[in-house]
């Protein structure tokens, strides 16, 4: 419907409205009917044959996916080293409980895969689980995309279940993980039609800072986004700074599940889109919007 309107095909709107039900009750029903399907507890859309794969987590990328289901599935399966998807690192392509049954050559070859990891982790960021998503993303990148013996970055097509490298060692299937930095850790999104920039940061707690420069409008040059954290006065001082942004700005700040002692910003406070966060936005274009928060 939105695409039809944007492209000027208003007559298509009624076509899609009649073809696909979009009322909230029906959308929720579609998720409820697939939750714990075929007896798989705290799992989404599990198949009859018992082959539990990460595509259950991919569904969390939908803005309609129930957050309470996402939380249950993450707690039950993401950190589960016995039956779930946490192997030598996160995520296994197939749940451990399914591995004894599915042992074909492809099953053994694709023990850990890059694109499935991206879809899985992206869903966690989108659902607002900043702590879990950032920790598991670091775990994946450090183990999948860095070879300790060679002391080099790598981008393999897959790791076998026994952790041997498989396939192309320069695989573009890894390219999606760039978005785990841009859209995950930094939470950057912008709209040219609405002229807005949003930063919903989830910087790993192990990092002191991160900085991004992104092209938005060519004539303006790059927009710089920086997040800093510093232990100070028995607490944590955290800051977001945006420079050279041609749009209105919204900053959604992750409190790392700590108590907010004070905040200082040249923006206006607004509603945050996730738990353990505080958000501010500008009423217009600001030369250097920023947000500083002291946490304990």
What is the role of each PLM region?
Residues 3-29, 67-82, 128-143, 193-202:
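Extended, well-ordered alpha-helical scaffold segments
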Residues 5-8, 105, 162:
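Short amphipathic alpha-helical segments at helix-loop
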Residues 13, 45, 106, 119-120, ...:
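Residues at structural and domain junctions
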Residues 119, 123-296:
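Non-catalytic C-terminal accessory modules of carbohydrate-active enzymes
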Residues 18-112, 145-159, 220:
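Extended glycan-interaction surfaces of carbohydrate-active proteins
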């Amino acid at each position: 419907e939105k695409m039809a309107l944007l492209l000027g095909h208003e007559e298509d709107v009624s076509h899609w409205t009649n073809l696909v039900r979009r009322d909230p009750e029906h959308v929720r029903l579609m998720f409820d009917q697939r939750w714990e399907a075929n007896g798989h507890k705290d799992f989404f859309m599990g198949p009859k044959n018992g082959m539990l794969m990460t595509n259950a987590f991919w569904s969390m990328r939908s803005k309609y996916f129930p957050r309470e289901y996402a939380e249950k599935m993450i707690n039950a399966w993401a950190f589960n080293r016995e039956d779930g998807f946490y192997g030598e690192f996160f995520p296994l392509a197939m749940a451990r409980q399914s591995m004894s049954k599915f042992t074909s050559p492809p099953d053994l070859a694709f023990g850990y895969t890059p694109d499935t990891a991206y879809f899985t982790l992206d869903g966690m960021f989108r659902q607002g689980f900043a702590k879990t998503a950032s920790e598991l993303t670091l775990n994946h990148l450090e183990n999948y995309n860095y070879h300790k013996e060679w002391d080099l970055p790598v981008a393999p097509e897959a790791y076998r279940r026994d952790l041997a490298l498989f396939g192309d060692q320069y695989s573009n299937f890894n390219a999606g993980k760039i978005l785990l930095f841009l859209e995950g850790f930094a939470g950057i999104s912008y709209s040219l039609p609405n002229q807005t920039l949003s930063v919903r940061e989830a910087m790993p707690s192990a990092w002191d800072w991160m900085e991004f420069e992104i092209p938005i409008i060519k004539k303006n040059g790059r927009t710089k986004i920086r997040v800093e954290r510093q232990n100070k006065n028995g607490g944590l001082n955290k800051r977001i700074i945006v420079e050279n942004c041609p749009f209105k700005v919204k900053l959604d700040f992750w409190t790392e599940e700590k108590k907010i002692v004070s905040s200082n910003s040249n923006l206006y406070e607004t509603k945050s889109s996730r738990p353990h966060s505080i958000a501010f936005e500008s009423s217009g274009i600001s030369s250097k919007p920023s947000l500083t928060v002291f946490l304990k």
